[in-house]
Every structure is written in C-alpha cells, then in structure tokens.
C-alpha cells in the first residue's frame, strides 16, 4: 500500500545553525499531512561562516487535493521567523 497521490513540493532553506531546526520543519510538515519523500541537511562550520549556517532541502508531498501552497507558505512563515530562515 503506497501513499496517496498528491502534490509534490521542494522546500529549501538556510538559517543560523542551532538545535531544533529539523524538528520544527518536520513537525510543521506532519501537522499539515505532508509526507517527506527526501531530506538533506548540513551545517556549515563556524570557521566558514560567522554564525554557522544550516542548510536544508526537503522534498515532500501533500495528499490531493491537499492544502493550497499559499496556506502552507503562510503557516511556515512562523517557523521561518523563529529560526531567522531564508527560504
């Protein structure tokens, strides 16, 4: 049994590195019925960047008809603000 077909999106972001980023992003997606298809992330060492940047790419799907992209973006803006993300 596979996941329901739906719309697929890719979220890319960067922010100062600190604990809780992966948890916050994945929790947001779960709360919005998203299925994470792939996720990559890495932290840039502080010697390369003064604030130690964190980078993440998440490929996810939401069940059809799913939530409109604008609604997901509005909701995610709260997560982005909390971590000072560029996305």
Show where each model-derived region lies.
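A conserved regulatory-domain signal marking ACT and ACT-like small-molecule sensing domains
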Residues: 1-87
